[in-house]
């Protein structure tokens, strides 16, 4: 229910229904990855009633769309789910792009109970690539039970798919189209896994309860299983993760700084963690243990 309400709120914000009359002079415009837009949509009411700042989230797009809008000064904040590259900065030489980390998105290859009970505990990149490309169709081919594999994947261009494609192919553009069963988001993926035999989908580890849903480890180059933990992601050992960043043109000031400060505050971080993301405190603690 929470995710359905948030989707409605996001639509409401994008249409500008929360702005009385014309857009307020100090409204902060933002767009980019949906992964970050969802928790920020939950912050709209608090920002307006307590900080007197209107946050307007523009519909559609992803990280690239957000950066393009920021670089052309049509938004004040780009919502990004990857680190900036030299090419990003070269594309907008007039912009002084500054980043503010707000969390980490950590995903796992989650499987249904029957796959886990059948003995599967980990997959290599080559095995996962074979499943994605349809060359591996039964779990017994990768050490699991004799069950048909049912892989559910987010649409191409969605955040979860991009993390998966980057891991398997190095560059997103090299990944083939996904023509199999699709899920629209984390909640749908979780429900589908729970009730579909032989199923696999991408889920935050926090959403796997080890009663009905189970997170697989990933085999590294030496064949060693690497668990989907914050510590392993922070140390660069676990590949299915990416940063969540707010990007501004120059150091944030005025209403933009209010929004950034809110998202890194305790209240903003609770919104980040509500969606299964890793908050800054936990991430920094893991990095300190390197």
What are these regions (language model features)?
Residues 7-18:
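Bacterial N-terminal signal peptides
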């Amino acid at each position: 229910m929470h995710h359905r309400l948030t989707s409605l709120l996001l639509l409401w914000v994008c249409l500008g229904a929360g702005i009385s009359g014309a857009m307020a002079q100090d409204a902060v415009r933002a767009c980019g990855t949906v992964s970050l837009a969802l928790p920020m949509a939950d912050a709209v009411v608090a920002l307006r009633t307590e900080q007197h700042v209107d946050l307007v989230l523009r519909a559609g797009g992803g990280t690239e769309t957000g950066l393009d809008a920021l670089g052309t000064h049509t938004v004040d904040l780009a919502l990004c789910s990857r680190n900036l590259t030299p090419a990003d900065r070269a594309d907008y030489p007039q912009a002084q792009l500054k980043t503010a980390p707000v969390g980490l998105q950590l995903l796992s290859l989650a499987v249904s109970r029957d796959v886990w009970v059948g003995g599967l505990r980990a997959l290599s990149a080559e095995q996962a690539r074979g499943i994605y490309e349809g060359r591996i169709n039964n779990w017994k081919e990768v050490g699991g039970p004799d069950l048909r594999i049912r892989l559910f994947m987010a649409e191409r261009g969605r955040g979860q798919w991009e993390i998966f494609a980057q891991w398997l192919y190095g560059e997103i553009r090299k990944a083939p189209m996904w023509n199999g069963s699709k899920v629209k988001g984390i909640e749908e993926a979780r429900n589908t896994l729970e009730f579909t035999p032989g199923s696999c989908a991408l889920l935050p580890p926090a959403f796997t309860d080890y009663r009905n849903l189970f997170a697989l480890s990933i085999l590294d180059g030496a064949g060693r299983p690497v668990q989907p933990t914050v510590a392993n992601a922070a140390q660069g050992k676990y590949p299915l993760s990416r940063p969540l960043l707010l990007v501004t043109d120059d150091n944030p000031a005025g209403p933009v700084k209010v929004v950034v400060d809110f998202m890194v505050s305790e209240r903003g971080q609770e919104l980040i963690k509500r969606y299964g993301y890793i908050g800054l405190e936990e991430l920094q603690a893991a990095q300190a243990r390197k």
